[in-house]
Amino acid sequence: MRQLEGYLSITPIAIDDTRDLREQVDQLSPGDIALFGTDRLGVPLEYLYIALNPRDDYAEGRRNSINEVGFYDATSYCSGVPLTTQPWAIKPYLTPRAALKDIDTMRDINSLEHPQAIRTFEPRGIIRLENREVAVITDFIQGVRSCDSLIDEYRGETILPEEKARLIARTAFATMHYFHSLEKPYTMNDAQIKNFAFTISTEPWCIDTETFKQTNKDSAKITRFVRDVGSCAYSMSGQYNYDGQRMLSPELIIEYFINQYEESISDLYSYGTVDIVQASIEGLKQDIARGA
């Protein structure tokens, strides 16, 4: 996101009606920031300008995101007077279509009413970059940490402390179970542990929804859900320290992730697909037990 570092100040544009963003995004010029809503801080947007100050330190706990997500302090000014500073995460997308799809996904996730709801970052606006790519602005929330960054902290050790390993496995299970159990379920489609996260209070948090897809559970598509489980288990199993030793034991992955998911199969899937999922999970469990 180094494209934004040269911007000393940007006068934002308002997008009032966000129900159909495609046409409005197409009209943006390179360098435009479009914020969702017509008013910020009681001041019309045309009287504001925004200065972006890079904050790479915000990437702490999100090591794998720093190459694609930029972190900034966005300070709003009116007539040269600073009004407020907000931490932003700004993520570029290859196409406007991908950006708009992800905005819809984030909004849908955050709108769900559920006793175990897992939230994600709230989209606040769009930036048209100089290369014509589109970037999405979201709130940045300190204290959210990706599971792989926790592993990085201990790569110099022989094995990940058991309580940390359990936290990773439980976070992955809780997140996956939640999205697979919804009335209109989501598959993650990139269920590596770098895409699982937790808050400072160790509650699951969703950090990357770009590959999420709402999918029904008919027999033709059931493998997409099973693939999520396998991707996550193999990702946990494939974490090694600097000496080449496995950091999460197969026994722990099976007990705190695979077995937990297996016990919920009858609740997640219909009678006609339970056997398919069960057989796949049994095969996965055998693979992980062998050290795959």
What are these regions, as identified by a protein language model?
Residues 204-291:
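C-lobe/activation-segment region of protein kinase-like
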Residues 118-168:
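Conserved structural core of kinase catalytic domains
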Residues 2-57:
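Juxta-kinase regulatory segment immediately upstream of eukaryotic protein kinase catalytic domains
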Residues 180-193, 198:
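Catalytic-loop of the protein kinase fold
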